[in-house]
UniProtKB/Swiss-Prot annotation:
One Gene Ontology MF term: signaling receptor binding
Record's protein name: Lantibiotic lichenicidin VK21 A2
Gene: lchA2
Keyword entries, A-Z: Antibiotic, Antimicrobial, Bacteriocin, Lantibiotic, Secreted, Thioether bond
The UniProt record lists the keyword Secreted: yes
Keyword match Secreted: yes
Domain of life: Bacteria
Organism of provenance: Bacillus licheniformis
Modification 2-oxobutanoic acid, positions: 41
Origin organism lineage: Bacteria, Bacillati, Bacillota, Bacilli, Bacillales
A single Gene Ontology CC term: extracellular space
Length: 72
């Protein structure tokens, strides 16, 4: 608390080299397992296939023919 109130004491600690809280990007990736993940891709899950199937089914049921018409 004294350091917070005393500007001279704060200045003395300003240049202190203390690595607490400093983590490199490589260390962060290793911690979360990000080294082996390709961020541009997302694996398809079973819920994705369910949504795709439902979307195609609904779309097909709304269109009376497979030909391109003004109604589709």
């Amino acid at each position: 608390m004294k350091t917070m109130k005393n500007s001279a004491a704060r200045e003395a600690f300003k240049g202190a080299n203390h690595p607490a809280g400093m983590v490199s990007e490589e260390e962060l990736k290793a911690l979360v397992g990000g080294n082996d993940v390709n961020p541009e891709t997302t694996p398809a899950t079973t819920s994705s296939w369910t949504c795709i199937t439902a979307g195609v089914t609904v779309s097909a049921s709304l269109c009376p023919t497979t030909k391109c018409t003004s109604r589709c």
